[in-house]
Amino acid sequence: MERKRIFAISGVKNSGKTTLICRLLEIFKDKGLKVAVLKHDGHDFVPDVPGTDTYCQLQSGAYGTAVFSAGKYMLVKQQPQISEKELAEFFPEADLILLEGFKYSTYPKIEIIRKGNSAESVCNPEKLMRSEEHTSELQSRSDLV
């Protein structure tokens, strides 16, 4: 089984992670790559809005719900913890998986530090993709550039 290509786009809140990811997704899509994004939310997100059937079902005690149509599905499962590696398994056909956030993960990452928003790095410098090794690897990847 081929190892998944996974890397993170990290930074503090409002640093531009989503903006960068959306721009990268456009480029990767134009290159014909299938890319999935896993986003970490440290605030226990609400997966649905009041008034929907699945929201009502979750509020009434369902430990999980799924909604699907001909072209997509959404799965919500009440579970104490799941790793990004386990979530990546939901996307076996992905050429690349981007992680949004995950500043403390062990995956290689790009950290966004933006003037007026973040003064210094919050990530492990050994995992940042700025070393000679990572730069050479990215430059040699004609399928990504």
Residue positions per predicted region:
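N-terminal phosphate/diphosphate-binding loop that engages ATP/GTP or pyrophosphate donors
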Residues: R23-P80
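Hydrophobic anchor at the beta1->P-loop junction of P-loop NTPases
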Residues: I9
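Phosphate-binding/switch loop-helix module in NTP-utilizing enzymes
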Residues: V76-S105
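Phosphate/Mg2+-binding loops and adjacent switch elements
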Residues: L96-S136
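Single conserved hydrophobic/aromatic residue that forms the stacking wall/gate
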Residues: E133-V145
